Amino acid sequence: MLITPNTTHEPRTPAIAEAIEEALEQRMLLTHPFYRRWEAGELQLGELDSYARNYRSFEAALPVVLSAVVQRLNTDGSAEVANRVQRNLDDELGRPESHLALFDRFAAAVSPPGSATEAAEAGPAADALVATYTDLVEEGPVAALSALAAYETQASAIAASKAEGLRRWYGIDGAGAAFWDVHAAMDADHGDWAIDALASLDADPAVVRVAAKRAADAWWTFLDECEAAAPVGASCAG
């Protein structure tokens, strides 16, 4: 994937984008066997249900991550960048409504009637994914924003692919696909915000690369766990 950054504001943006791209080598999520099977309609509903139960833990943690980054940036005197992150937090909490609420409708669409996705216990890789982001937040805004950029730069394409797969293969539309529709449109509009924020902080591309790689590896391991639970004979080879 070639990340084409917005270069109108910060001269360091291309170097940051290149660092993110290098971190994502062999870790572009749409190439993972689990997402390839989603695109091809080869996932069973039970796999989508399990995925939703695990992914929810990250979606629930994301506002906490963003809030912590905003607080740290304000403490460090980086109010302009803090405002940029705050806008994304505001989107997460209420544009067009809480994204967690939108996600729960997706989860309900792929889960057995009467199941409570929000009460489900996440698996080890999902817990590790959240822990990775939490650890990077504690390291500081550059590390946290690098982790966010590792996902945000590919989020629009991932969301669009998921929404298309849900409609085409599983007959899930409307409320069931809205979470992915919102992210496909919203992230296409400003998916490079984290790269711009890193450039505004004059982040060291080497530091960005290391933190983004940690996040990318955690996402890949999460999908490995999803794929490992596939029924015998269902997993994608290669």
Residue ranges and their predicted role:
Residues 2-238:
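Non-heme di-metal
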